[in-house]
Curated annotation (Swiss-Prot):
Organism: Deinococcus radiodurans (strain ATCC 13939 / DSM 20539 / JCM 16871 / CCUG 27074 / LMG 4051 / NBRC 15346 / NCIMB 9279 / VKM B-1422 / R1)
Keywords of the record: Amino-acid biosynthesis, Branched-chain amino acid biosynthesis, Leucine biosynthesis, Lyase
Cross-referenced Pfam families: Aconitase_C
Disordered: annotated segments: 163-208
Keyword Acetylation: no
Recorded superkingdom: Bacteria
Full protein name: 3-isopropylmalate dehydratase small subunit 2
Subunit structure: Heterodimer of LeuC and LeuD.
Amino acid sequence: MPTVHVFARDHINTDEIIPARHLTTDVESELAKYAMEDYDKDFVRRVQPGDIIVAGADFGCGSSREHAVWALRGAGVSAVIAPNFARIYYRNSINNGFLALECEGITELFQDGEEAELDLKGGTIRNPRTGKELSFVPVPQFALDVQKAGGWLEYMKAGEDVEGERLDNASTSAGHGHAGTPLGDDPAKEDGPRPEQASGHQKEEHHA
């Protein structure tokens, strides 16, 4: 089970998540070295892959910087759970396939260092030590798909690959016509689109 790191204060800003003096790189592994440095210098030594941050309201406020998401993800954090998030930070989290879960009363459910049982499909988080459980705002399927893909760009690329494969299959099927009816024996009875029609449709799909 993941360990919970509690940062109970409200309005933790992006400069505390990753100080501006370290914004000289976009490499997550480098940014990770300084995650939460101005709030808790020992955080990066304690955090393990899959751990969770529990925070106060308006997490990620302040200046807009995707580095604030990259630093936590690079450090191994799997999710941040807070009553609510700064709008831009929340959007950046979704775009980068990082979980930002909204849950009222979350800072009262855990003490720092406790373990958590997180059920994304069920929309619950539980403290196994106390047996107490809270529900969080359900994660939209779209956001889960983006998270599974690893971010918005990866999600879009995967969609393009699937669409390209679908079009290739459709083009191949059209080229063979119906089973038992060789294409070209009787042009008037051809079922598949003419090559120029298929090509034009494919180009149009790629431009959409």
